[in-house]
Amino acid sequence: MASTAATAALSIIKSTGGAAVTRSSRASFGHIPSTSVSARRLGFSAVVDSRFSVHVASKVHSVRGKGARGVITMAKKSVGDLNSVDLKGKKVFVRADLNVPLDDNQNITDDTRIRAAIPTIKFLIENGAKVILSTHLGRPKGVTPKFSLAPLVPRLSELLGIEVVKADDCIGPEVETLVASLPEGGVLLLENVRFYKEEEKNEPDFAKKLASLADLYVNDAFGTAHRAHASTEGVTKFLKPSVAGFLLQKELDYLVGAVSNPKRPFAAIVGGSKVSSKIGVIESLLEKCDILLLGGGMIFTFYKAQGLSVGSSLVEEDKLELATTLLAKAKARGVSLLLPTDVVIADKFAPDANSKIVPASAIPDGWMGLDIGPDSVKTFNEALDTTQTVIWNGPMGVFEFEKFAKGTEAVANKLAELSKKGVTTIIGGGDSVAAVEKVGVAGVMSHISTGGGASLELLEGKVLPGVVALDEATPVTV
């Protein structure tokens, strides 16, 4: 058994006491206003939707009145910058992400992405635009009937309160005829854009054919913004203006704005199985955060890098030096880096495995760590209680197995508690989203990212082609 001092050393790695939590000179972002009538007109009712509707309303009011955007934003023009003069009678190509799951009977099992697209579409139709809606569904290889968008039409029509017309293709004479007959305030859903291989290849001729259907372009598909496809990047070369939809803008505001210029202290929670998959995120967040909490399978690489025994836990041997470098970088920057002090270990990787809680420094041979322990949860919670902004990406353990889900669930519940107290809580996509939904606290978080790979790449500081292609915004005072 390692000494108490050795165990304590795992808990907090920092330079000098208090340095991390006193960096408060950077500007914080503003208060979220109460839901307005104009926000409600955009079609929200649930808690999570009301938060989004407030955000949408702030985008509209920031341009039409004297209001300003609530957070520092990526400088891209938004659909909220447009009005009825810009939109009435105009054909607007809207790229949304309606890639929803369907069961064997083609029934939608989760309509979250459809509901997330409604504010932008509703804003456009209320301002007299003719909406030409484009999306992908699944990964079809050519025209594949089971990936047709037909099952989406009833739910879209219900949420919008109008009859959505569906085309049998996304380009060609028949589509052009439907576009020509589209009334102001009407919506035409094009068939799955990925039925054409030219979409993912971003072929200019295909992009030009898509663009020829419309007068201007709105990208509201954050989940595909990291891909340079014809409908996300190519069309912008032929359509002006090309602007961000409300959902895409909200993602940028939180994942770029709130993270780059947070209310402090700012904590980042990063989990997941491998250090290699989160290197970019960790390195980027070390430049911005005051507190960094690490969990998930990656922690065992950090433990081994410090000379600890990890039993048969997952370790990336080729990342031991990197782990040491990241620990040193955190210390040099005055970031409080917390590793779990205890872990839940198992004798096999299975939901029915035998398990027990041990200090992180005392994992026996033949056992593997599959979750953080209760002492770690307590330490993490105490650190999070000091924060004003928290971003979370990645589970604390194998939360698919109920026996090893407690750490992840504890983080989800803690963030829900903090959010209710006014702390900005950002769920950065992927498994963290599944975790807060499983626990039933998704509705109280400040922001839940709709992107998987796009969220990670944005947090890593990478350029997203679908965002870069959009028009620059007129400067707005923040």
UniProtKB/Swiss-Prot annotation:
AMP binds at residues 274, 278, 297, 369, 400. InterPro entries: Phosphoglycerate_kinase, Phosphoglycerate_kinase_CS, Phosphoglycerate_kinase_N, Phosphoglycerate_kinase_sf. Its EC number is 2.7.2.3. One of its GO terms (cellular component) is chloroplast stroma. It is an enzyme of class 2 (transferase). GO terms for biological process: galactolipid biosynthetic process; glycolytic process; reductive pentose-phosphate cycle; regulation of defense response to virus by host; thylakoid membrane organization. Residues 1-74 form a transit peptide. Keywords: ATP-binding, Calvin cycle, Chloroplast, Kinase, Magnesium, Metal-binding, Nucleotide-binding, Phosphoprotein, Plastid, Transferase, Transit peptide. The modification Phosphoserine is found at residue 78. GO terms for molecular function: ATP binding; metal ion binding; phosphoglycerate kinase activity; protein kinase activity. Belongs to the phosphoglycerate kinase family. HAMAP family: Phosphoglyc_kinase. This is Phosphoglycerate kinase 2, chloroplastic. It comes from Arabidopsis thaliana.
